[in-house]
């Protein structure tokens, strides 16, 4: 039996080895798989290779996971239609008199699009492509134009149907429908806080916003009304998907399939997108995104199994419990850990890798697992706009290559 000091030393060595591999530039899924195989073989022997294959498969052997590619397909269908543009234009025309109305329009469009796609990158790309050039054209600073979309895009991981919450539900065994319900109000509250900040900033601080409002041509009532028929069908789909989820009519997997089907019907009717080539392009992009996420989930599941098999999970959980008897001290330390993890890893990987460690600690100290899920997700939101990974930052950089990453980060 190893002493406690040598056991702790082994845990730290494994952590350092994992970090070295992940920071080497290897794709996350391949890096986690390599670390898992190396650790299992070195400590347990080559007979663990069979277990490796079984565990990798088990990580994807869940019917609920079917909802992820369906929601991605739903989001990609909307992203490849002019829906984002119509959402943006519609909100802009109705909010034109409000100081910072263009910023608020972007945030509102991000919120609605997030409820359609469940994906932060898709939200950034769809709304940013239209919103950023328009804001720059009307005199807003590059920081405000890019930062608004980068931050607004993070709502995609909190407002249901959120892929991150689906993965959390699968990893922790919590109800996905209840997680969606828990994320709904905080998501729109966060969007409201973004909007209030935009209003205050534009009215009292940002002179560019005042100039943009002064130079703005007033939209006519006809222009305001003509965009509504293009927006209402998508709002109806959001309401329908949420209703069948919360009303107990369908499971998340079934609701995602119905939502994807309705979105395809809607883009065919409203935007005349029904050509096989265009549909295939949407499906192809969705498949690539889905396979990437599924690979990360399977590799993270394998990594979590490896940590548990080598008693790393149990050691870390016990160490965290012994750090302090004050539950709020533990809560703050967990938040710091999640923030740092979110800086370097995608949300899906962080959830699958750490939930087995953190959930027992959280429940031991009496925290509600659903409440903690929202706190967890908000930490992942921060990671999406924080270097060195900061996925949203690089998506915005791709839309505006002439704006430096530091300017986007300041925004």
Task: Give, region by region, the residue ranges found by the protein language model.
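Alpha-helical transmembrane segments of multi-pass membrane proteins
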Residues: 68, 100-114, 138-155, 179, ...
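Generic alpha-helical transmembrane segments of integral inner-membrane proteins
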Residues: 13-23, 34-41, 69, 73-77, ...
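Membrane-embedded alpha-helical segments and adjacent helix-loop junctions characteristic
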Residues: 42, 46-133, 280-365
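Juxtamembrane helix-boundary/capping and inter-helix hinge elements in multi-pass membrane proteins
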Residues: 82-83, 97, 130, 134-145, ...
